[in-house]
């Protein structure tokens, strides 16, 4: 059992406050550093690290010493796909509760999706998100702005980028209009920012509920065919081919056919990136039978063949990063029949241990897995985080890699508990989360 505690981030650590992290296994996935040593922070920055640091003793001027007890000290996770529901649906989640959940999961930076009420398609809403983050967050809050306004016209992308947007998407819904998508890709290339697509042809998905296949037929439910995803991926890649310097990102990819198209585009030199969720790496349509509406998500859990393709795509680099699509819902929207229940699961507090299953079962190396959770997502949104380097922001976590525990949704910090991973036995526990040099979360074992 662990006692958990949190501290709001505010403006980060005091400028002159120093912290020495000793007896650490320091891992930096980008440089492939993996050493036993120490690390020093001052204010919000990493000052120094190495095997020989503090060999002559820790200076008395150091304000705080944290003994890592040979656990891993690594960059904090970066989740570029979360729904914090604020403004408009604060009964599901808020920036406060969502970021508290992130801190508990070792996630030091999140990117909020813009399908709030109202959407992040105006400067006013963008400013509101930034204000609420400063007031109530435990981690760094970034946001995508909407590609379109409520009337389906193009958002003022230049002003929204200036207001802090790290990219553009209509996630929750696709951009179905090809002309609008082409215009968004064109403008984004001029702004040097990313356009992210929720790839779903609504005519083909046709208000389906789960993957079209064996399980949908067995349960008598309308299915969502995998071509509804791949056809939009194919269309968008065709649209970007004649636009210079454009970056196109596919959210929560789920089908083998989509991956084949993405692989071909990358081989042609196009700047195409994509993400996969932990649940699409570990669950299939069969889990809908076991977990019911807790396994109802969009895109749906697909076949075992698709799942294996996701794992292989992550290993070989076709898939760039892991992101949760953290989608909180209150109980009464999930305790319904499959054909009426809401889509989505929460994922911030299970992101790391579920992803680590791929390491613990020998599928992928630890360094390569952690890369997809740290600097690789940072590269997609162009933020200087996810690395251990001198002068870089001190966004760090301490991880007990082999600690075994059982997921308990009732202990989630998130306001919502909709997860199919309840009672799953996992390995890997976040003991401390440090954001801008400031500890915002600790888990201390009860004796």
Swiss-Prot record:
<comment type="pathway">
    <text>Pyrimidine metabolism; UMP biosynthesis via de novo pathway; (S)-dihydroorotate from bicarbonate: step 3/3.</text>
</comment>
<comment type="similarity">
    <text>Belongs to the metallo-dependent hydrolases superfamily. DHOase family. Class I DHOase subfamily.</text>
</comment>
<feature type="binding site">
    <location>
        <position position="252"/>
    </location>
    <ligand>
        <name>Zn(2+) 2</name>
    </ligand>
</feature>
<feature type="binding site">
    <location>
        <position position="81"/>
    </location>
    <ligand>
        <name>Zn(2+) 1</name>
    </ligand>
</feature>
<dbReference type="InterPro" id="IPR002195">
    <property type="entry name" value="Dihydroorotase_CS"/>
</dbReference>
<dbReference type="GO" id="GO:0004038">
    <property type="term" value="F:allantoinase activity"/>
</dbReference>
<feature type="binding site">
    <location>
        <position position="83"/>
    </location>
    <ligand>
        <name>Zn(2+) 1</name>
    </ligand>
</feature>
<dbReference type="InterPro" id="IPR032466">
    <property type="entry name" value="Metal_Hydrolase"/>
</dbReference>
<comment type="function">
    <text>Catalyzes the reversible cyclization of carbamoyl aspartate to dihydroorotate.</text>
</comment>
<feature type="binding site">
    <location>
        <position position="171"/>
    </location>
    <ligand>
        <name>Zn(2+) 1</name>
    </ligand>
</feature>
<dbReference type="GO" id="GO:0044205">
    <property type="term" value="P:'de novo' UMP biosynthetic process"/>
</dbReference>
<feature type="binding site">
    <location>
        <position position="298"/>
    </location>
    <ligand>
        <name>substrate</name>
    </ligand>
</feature>
<feature type="binding site">
    <location>
        <begin position="343"/>
        <end position="344"/>
    </location>
    <ligand>
        <name>substrate</name>
    </ligand>
</feature>
<dbReference type="InterPro" id="IPR006680">
    <property type="entry name" value="Amidohydro-rel"/>
</dbReference>
<feature type="active site">
    <location>
        <position position="325"/>
    </location>
</feature>
<dbReference type="Pfam" id="PF01979">
    <property type="entry name" value="Amidohydro_1"/>
</dbReference>
<feature type="binding site">
    <location>
        <position position="198"/>
    </location>
    <ligand>
        <name>Zn(2+) 2</name>
    </ligand>
</feature>
<feature type="binding site">
    <location>
        <begin position="83"/>
        <end position="85"/>
    </location>
    <ligand>
        <name>substrate</name>
    </ligand>
</feature>
<dbReference type="GO" id="GO:0008270">
    <property type="term" value="F:zinc ion binding"/>
</dbReference>
<keyword id="KW-0862">Zinc</keyword>
<keyword id="KW-0479">Metal-binding</keyword>
<keyword id="KW-0665">Pyrimidine biosynthesis</keyword>
<feature type="binding site">
    <location>
        <position position="115"/>
    </location>
    <ligand>
        <name>substrate</name>
    </ligand>
</feature>
<dbReference type="InterPro" id="IPR011059">
    <property type="entry name" value="Metal-dep_hydrolase_composite"/>
</dbReference>
<dbReference type="InterPro" id="IPR004722">
    <property type="entry name" value="DHOase"/>
</dbReference>
<feature type="binding site">
    <location>
        <position position="329"/>
    </location>
    <ligand>
        <name>substrate</name>
    </ligand>
</feature>
<dbReference type="GO" id="GO:0005737">
    <property type="term" value="C:cytoplasm"/>
</dbReference>
<dbReference type="InterPro" id="IPR050138">
    <property type="entry name" value="DHOase/Allantoinase_Hydrolase"/>
</dbReference>
<protein>
    <recommendedName>
        <fullName>Dihydroorotase</fullName>
        <ecNumber>3.5.2.3</ecNumber>
    </recommendedName>
</protein>
<dbReference type="GO" id="GO:0004151">
    <property type="term" value="F:dihydroorotase activity"/>
</dbReference>
<dbReference type="GO" id="GO:0006145">
    <property type="term" value="P:purine nucleobase catabolic process"/>
</dbReference>
<keyword id="KW-0378">Hydrolase</keyword>
<feature type="binding site">
    <location>
        <position position="171"/>
    </location>
    <ligand>
        <name>Zn(2+) 2</name>
    </ligand>
</feature>
<feature type="binding site">
    <location>
        <position position="325"/>
    </location>
    <ligand>
        <name>Zn(2+) 1</name>
    </ligand>
</feature>
């Amino acid at each position: 059992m662990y006692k958990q505690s949190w501290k709001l981030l505010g403006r980060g650590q005091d400028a002159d406050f120093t912290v020495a992290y000793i007896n650490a296994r320091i891992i930096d996935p980008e440089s492939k550093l993996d050493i036993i040593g120490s690390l020093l922070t001052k204010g919000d920055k990493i000052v120094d690290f190495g095997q020989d640091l503090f060999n002559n003793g820790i200076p008395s001027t150091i304000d705080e010493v944290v003994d890592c007890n040979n656990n891993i000290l690594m960059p904090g996770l970066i989740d570029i796909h979360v729904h914090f529901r604020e403004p408009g649906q604060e009964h599901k989640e808020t920036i406060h509760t969502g970021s508290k959940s992130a801190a508990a999961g070792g996630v030091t930076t999140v990117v909020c999706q813009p399908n709030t009420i109202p959407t992040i398609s105006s400067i006013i809403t963008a400013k509101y998100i930034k204000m609420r983050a400063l007031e109530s967050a435990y981690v760094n809050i970034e946001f995508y702005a909407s590609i379109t306004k409520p009337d389906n016209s193009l958002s003022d992308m230049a002003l929204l980028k200036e207001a802090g947007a790290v990219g553009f998407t209509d996630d929750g819904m696709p951009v179905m209009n090809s002309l609008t998508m082409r215009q968004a890709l064109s403008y984004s290339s001029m702004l040097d920012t990313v356009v992210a697509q929720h790839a779903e042809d609504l005519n083909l998905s046709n208000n389906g509920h789960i993957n079209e296949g064996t399980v949908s037929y067995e349960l008598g439910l309308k299915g969502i065919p995998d071509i509804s995803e791949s056809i939009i991926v194919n269309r968008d890649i065709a649209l970007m081919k004649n636009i210079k310097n454009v970056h196109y990102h596919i959210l929560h990819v789920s089908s083998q056919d989509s991956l084949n198209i993405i692989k071909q585009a990358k081989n042609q030199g196009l700047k195409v990136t994509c993400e996969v969720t932990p649940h699409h790496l570990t669950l299939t349509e069969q889990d809908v039978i076991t977990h019911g509406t807790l396994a109802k998500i969009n895109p749906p859990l697909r076949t075992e063949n698709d799942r294996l393709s996701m794992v292989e795509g992550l290993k070989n680099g076709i898939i760039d990063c892991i992101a949760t699509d953290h989608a909180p819902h209150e109980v009464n929207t999930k305790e319904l029949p499959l054909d009426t229940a809401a889509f989505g699961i929460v994922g911030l507090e299970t992101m790391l241990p579920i992803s680590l299953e791929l390491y613990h079962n020998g599928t992928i190396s630890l360094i390569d897995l952690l890369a997809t959770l740290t600097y690789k997502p940072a590269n997609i949104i162009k933020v200087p985080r996810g690395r251990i380097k001198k002068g870089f922001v001190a966004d760090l976590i301490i991880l007990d890699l082999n600690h075994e525990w059982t997921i308990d949704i009732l202990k989630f910090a998130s306001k919502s508990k909709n997860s199919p991973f309840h009672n799953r036995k996992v390995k890997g526990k976040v003991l401390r989360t440090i954001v801008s040099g400031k500890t915002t979360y600790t888990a201390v074992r009860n004796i």
